[in-house]
């Protein structure tokens, strides 16, 4: 019927290396990411505790975790998912854990010919722009990590009428995923209820932009404030009255 979810799946090699997130990876893959981080001069932090990163909600969701998350929210296996991302790390092995739950996973390379994509292939920013446009126009947008593009897409969708954007509570989800892994929880109605309750107020409904934390001064004040391009309400969104004026 043309409806689809746009999934901003931040599971590229450089993202995992930069954040130090190695959960679910093999030892060889983890070593490869560590070496990449150590050899990238402009990345200042070299030693990262992957477990602490994940527990703190600072890691992108894995393809498997995204699949579990979407099923818990009640999306059927027939759901079309457009993956807005660069090359997924360990594509076949890791993506299979998402595709096994949602077979209708598509990429821009599957929707356009090589000739059509050729005009953009040498410019990463232009291929990212394609993902951006498709994400803005999707029925539902879900980012697996809160990077700059995800924030910009969310803000754009708010500006266009607060289109549905589901913002995963990564810190909360990790606790639930770990309970699944340890056998304390099982996938099913009870698990779904926990996930849905956790995300009841994280679906792009209108809300005022969050200001800086109280007591914070100087430049740090701006770092604690929700960015304008992530949520332009109320400064840049008109509010209409019953009479039609704004």
Language model features with spans:
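N-terminal targeting/anchoring "stem" of glycan-biosynthesis enzymes
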Residues: 1-246
């Amino acid at each position: 019927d043309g409806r689809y979810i746009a999934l901003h799946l931040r599971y590229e090699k450089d993202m995992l290396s930069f954040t130090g997130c190695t959960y679910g990876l093999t030892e060889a893959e983890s070593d490869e990411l560590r070496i990449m981080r150590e050899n990238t001069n402009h990345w200042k932090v070299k030693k990262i505790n992957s477990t602490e990163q994940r527990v703190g909600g600072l890691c992108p969701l894995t393809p498997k975790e995204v699949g579990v998350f979407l099923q818990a929210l009640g999306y059927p296996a027939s759901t079309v998912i457009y993956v807005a991302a660069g090359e997924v790390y360990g594509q076949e092995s890791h993506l299979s854990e998402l595709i096994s739950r949602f077979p209708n996973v598509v990429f821009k390379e599957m929707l356009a010919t090589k000739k059509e994509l050729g005009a953009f292939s040498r410019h990463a920013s232009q291929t990212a722009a394609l993902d951006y446009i498709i994400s803005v126009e999707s029925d539902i947008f879900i980012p697996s990590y809160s990077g700059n593009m995800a924030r910009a897409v969310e803000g754009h969708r708010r500006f266009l009428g607060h289109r549905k954007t589901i913002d995963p509570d990564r810190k909360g989800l990790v606790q639930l995923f770990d309970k699944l892994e340890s056998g304390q929880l099982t996938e099913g109605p009870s698990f779904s209820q926990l996930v849905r309750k956790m995300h009841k107020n994280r679906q792009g409904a209108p809300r005022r932009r969050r200001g800086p934390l109280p007591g914070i001064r100087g430049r740090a004040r701006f770092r604690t404030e929700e960015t304008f391009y992530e949520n332009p309400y109320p400064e840049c969104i008109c509010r209409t009255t019953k009479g039609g004026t704004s």
